[in-house]
């Protein structure tokens, strides 16, 4: 729940660059992601699609991802701590529209704070959307009190300012978005060493990095904030949940039962019917018998309309996949869909493109983070070397997610046959080995490599 923006703006004497539509959208995405959408009630259940979509994209983006800072052991240690939890936080970014990596000095070292989009408020930004001033929120619950820390960053004319404020309020009042009363930072042990104000001269960029989901913001096209990966599918997800609930109702409503007269069963000493143990759900008893005074026994087993209902749900899921940039079959069943080779390829390419765009945005954010880490380390006189991002930082993504490997290998094989590519490069790519190992795998000249170097290879 985002705190009252007006209270924060008044307290810090600033203007928050977020309108009500954007604030409401972020709150909606957060509620959908936590399986608590506003349409949830006794009759409408949720499939958990927002979480599944964010999780799958985060998995595809970060699978087998490796990155390191080669010339700074101290910074790299902190950086690897972030890399180890990057998939989880990429999922949060996908769900909520973005996250902030915010390095800070603590106990003689550089640490990284990760701020999700519902705890982050932009204040000012450049014409290209780079955020230069922002408010970060952190909350702590202590017994019946809620403590909120506001951290304000401003980058202006190569001067950088960081201010910290702390507030407390009673946590027993539901839906209270107020800040409460201002208190000292040492009210919370984790905050007692924080400085109330820091001023840095000759700063080159903000001391935080914003990982923004690379999609157009249809909520507020002027906002620097990113949107959820399922922002274009909120209505479809609602309809899918309703259709899913109809299926659950259909299964429950057509559940096998036996309508019987109470006279079928004997009673215990307290007058309760003695229904066979474990069969209470099967028998539905009624206090009647037919006109001929016979004990009624009527099985209830109506036909189920599951095929039509599931087909309807599947259509919603395919539309959601399209809007979220996922390949068909990620959420939906594809057996009942006749697709041409061109349509299947286009579907996969859509997913590849989505993942690649998010990877690029994440890599750019990590580069900015590393620069900020080095700048803060120098400010606090921590001995670190200058970092050349292109030379000293490596990013290794799993290309098999982005590239159609079979097509790529076939193209390489054709190049080898045409004599414009060395065979060991093809083998290295196909089997994931070095060029030296690939050369050892190849038959010796004069044995089987008489004409085509690929004649002996199995396809």
Predicted regions and their residues:
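Extended, charged amphipathic alpha-helical segments
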Residues: 189-346, 382
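Activation/maturation switch segments at domain boundaries
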Residues: 412-459
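Extended, helix-rich architectural segments
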Residues: 1-132, 139-143, 334, 458-459
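Extended, regular secondary-structure scaffolds
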Residues: 100-227
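Extended, non-catalytic structural segments that build the interaction scaffolds
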Residues: 23-42, 288-323, 339-362, 392-426
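Active/binding-pocket-proximal capping segment
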Residues: 320, 334-341, 372-376, 382-393, ...
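Long, compositionally biased
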Residues: 351-367, 446-459
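Short coil/turn segments at secondary-structure boundaries
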Residues: 89, 103-105, 251-260, 330-335, ...
């Amino acid at each position: 729940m985002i705190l009252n923006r007006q209270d924060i703006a008044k307290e810090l004497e600033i203007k928050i660059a977020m309108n009500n539509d954007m604030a409401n959208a972020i709150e909606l995405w957060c509620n959908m992601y936590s399986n608590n959408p506003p349409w949830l009630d006794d009759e409408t259940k949720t499939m958990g699609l927002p979480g599944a979509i964010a999780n799958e994209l985060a998995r595809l983006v970060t699978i087998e991802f490796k990155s390191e800072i080669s010339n700074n052991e101290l910074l790299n240690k902190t950086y690897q701590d972030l890399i180890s939890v990057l998939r989880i936080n990429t999922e949060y970014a996908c769900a909520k529209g973005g996250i902030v990596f915010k390095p800070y000095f603590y106990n003689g070292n550089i640490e990284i704070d990760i701020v999700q989009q519902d705890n982050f408020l932009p204040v000012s930004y450049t014409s290209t959307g780079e955020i230069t001033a922002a408010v970060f929120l952190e909350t702590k619950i202590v017994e019946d009190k809620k403590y909120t820390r506001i951290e304000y960053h401003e980058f202006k004319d190569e001067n950088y300012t960081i201010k910290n404020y702390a507030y407390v309020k009673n946590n027993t009042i539901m839906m209270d978005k107020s800040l409460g009363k201002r208190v000292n930072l040492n009210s919370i042990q984790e905050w007692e060493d924080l400085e109330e104000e820091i001023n840095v001269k000759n700063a080159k960029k903000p001391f935080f990095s914003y990982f923004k989901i690379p999609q157009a913001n249809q909520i507020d096209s002027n906002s620097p904030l990113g949107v959820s990966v399922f922002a274009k599918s909120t209505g479809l997800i609602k309809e899918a949940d309703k259709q899913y609930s109809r299926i659950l109702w259909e299964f429950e409503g057509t559940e096998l039962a036996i309508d019987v007269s109470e006279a079928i069963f004997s009673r215990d000493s307290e007058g309760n019917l003695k229904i066979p143990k474990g069969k209470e759900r099967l028998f539905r008893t009624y206090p009647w018998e037919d006109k001929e005074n016979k004990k009624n026994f009527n099985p209830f087993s109506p036909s189920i309309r599951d095929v039509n209902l599931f087909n309807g749900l599947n259509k919603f899921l395919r539309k959601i996949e399209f809007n979220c940039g996922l390949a068909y079959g990620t959420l939906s069943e594809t057996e009942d869909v006749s697709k041409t080779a061109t349509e299947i390829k286009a579907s996969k390419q859509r997913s590849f493109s989505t993942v690649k765009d998010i990877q690029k945005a994440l890599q750019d954010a990590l580069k900015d983070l590393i620069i900020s880490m080095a700048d803060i380390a120098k400010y606090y006189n921590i001995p670190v070397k200058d970092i050349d991002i292109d030379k000293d930082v490596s990013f290794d993504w799993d290309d098999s997610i982005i590239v159609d490997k079979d097509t790529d290998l076939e193209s390489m094989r054709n190049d080898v046959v045409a004599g414009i590519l060395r065979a060991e490069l093809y083998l290295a790519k196909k089997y994931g080995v070095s060029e030296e190992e690939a050369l050892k795998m190849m038959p010796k000249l004069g044995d089987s490599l008489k004409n085509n170097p690929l004649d002996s290879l199995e396809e």
